Structure formats: structure tokens, C-alpha cells
């Protein structure tokens, strides 16, 4: 598995990060003699602009030039944000629209992250692993290879308190929809976590657990192969 960032490293990263309030500004007006700051990204025609900038920089510009503006609309989706979304340009995985993956998360080759899934800072999605719709991997949560994390499932994050141990999901594990894996829990290779289970203790390799709190109900050898199959075709990319 890929090496974890420690809680202290993540805390330091967040603490040191320049907090950002980016704006997208749609503005009409008389800008013939206006010089825009170099930090602005400005698009459009002479009288109609789309501007990307920081909120404090826009405030200064607006105070100086508001008399030239005839129409204005501002989009802001965060305030004093410390962690940007991850640049996925070189990520060799299938990432669907609406997934939220923060910087310093690791997405390994052939993984799949579905719509609405959230991958927090320091989390690791292993090779060939699928994170289904609206599932959440909290800070430092780790999955191994060929894991399926079902829709709405939660792998608890552990950044605060920093002493807590992260969730670790070993290879070839199936986690059902809306299951919750609490901090510090390790789920052994090949195990199955039933839908809706709340897992408070380690799960042995090859076990099937269900309930609240989750308990071992049988072994995966007793489960039909078709009910625990990982489908490689769903992880296929264009370059394969």
C-alpha cells in the first residue's frame, strides 16, 4: 500500500496553506481605460467580462471602479478554503462528474470514483478499487486493491484527534451500501461488510459481517462467487 501522510503532516499542510476565496465574476460595463490587476484572469469583450480572482482583490477593484459597472453577478462556492480539489490531469483512473477529491488524496491506477463520492485529504484509493455514488473516504482512510465501497458507505476520517488510527481496508473487500467503518478499524483481505452495517472492531480476513454493531455471521467461502465478484470491465480505460 501507498504510505500514509501522518495526521501531523496533514495538520501542518492545512495550517500553512494560504486560505482562498476564489470568485467567478460576470460583469458588464465601460472598461476601455481600465487596467486589470495581473492576478486577475480576464475573458470576454470590451464591455463584458468574466473574471477569475480572489475575493479580497475583487473588493479593492470594485471600490475603485464600481461607477463603471452596469451589471454584476458573482459566483462563490467556498470561503477561506485551505485545501483545493485534486488536479486529476495525470490520474490513470475513471473519475465521474460530481466526485469531490481533495488535494493530497491518492487515486491509484484503474480505480473508479463515482458521482457524489468524497475523497478527503490523505485518503488512498487502491488500484482497481471502486468508490460508489455518495460514498465517503475520510481523511487518511485507505483501501487496498480491488475493493468495492458501496453507495453511501462511510470510511471514517482521522485527522482530528491526530492520535487516532486510520481506517484500513485490505485487498478484495466488498463494503455494502450505507455501511459505516469507524476510525481505527482494519477490514481483512477478502472480507464482506453487509449493507448498513456499523463496524466498530477489526474484521478478520475472509469473514462476512453484518448488523449494528457488526458481527461475523459466516465466511466468504459460503457466499456464491457471483455475489462477490469484482468486474474488471468496469475499470477498463481507453488505453487498455
From Swiss-Prot:
The question of whether Lipoprotein is a record keyword is answered with: no
Q: What is its EC number?
A: 2.3.1.89
Q: Which GO terms describe its molecular function?
A: tetrahydrodipicolinate N-acetyltransferase activity
Q: In which organism is this protein found?
A: Staphylococcus epidermidis (strain ATCC 35984 / DSM 28319 / BCRC 17069 / CCUG 31568 / BM 3577 / RP62A)
Catalytic activity from the UniProt record: (S)-2,3,4,5-tetrahydrodipicolinate + acetyl-CoA + H2O = L-2-acetamido-6-oxoheptanedioate + CoA
The name on file for this protein is 2,3,4,5-tetrahydropyridine-2,6-dicarboxylate N-acetyltransferase
Pathway, per record: Amino-acid biosynthesis; L-lysine biosynthesis via DAP pathway; LL-2,6-diaminopimelate from (S)-tetrahydrodipicolinate (acetylase route): step 1/3
Q: Which Pfam families does the record cross-reference, listed alphabetically?
A: DapH_N, Hexapep_2
- Enumerate the InterPro entries for this protein: DapH (IPR019873), DapH_N (IPR013710), Hexapep (IPR001451), Hexapep_transf_CS (IPR018357), Trans_hexapeptide_repeat (IPR050179), Trimer_LpxA-like_sf (IPR011004)
> What's this chain's function?
Catalyzes the transfer of an acetyl group from acetyl-CoA to tetrahydrodipicolinate.
Indicate whether Amino-acid biosynthesis appears among the record's keywords: yes
- By its UniProt entry, which CDD domains does this protein fall under? LbH_THP_succinylT (cd03350)
Q: Which family does it belong to?
A: Belongs to the transferase hexapeptide repeat family. DapH subfamily.
Q: Which keywords does the record carry?
A: Acyltransferase, Amino-acid biosynthesis, Diaminopimelate biosynthesis, Lysine biosynthesis, Repeat, Transferase
Q: Give the top-level enzyme category.
A: transferase
- One GO BP: lysine biosynthetic process via diaminopimelate
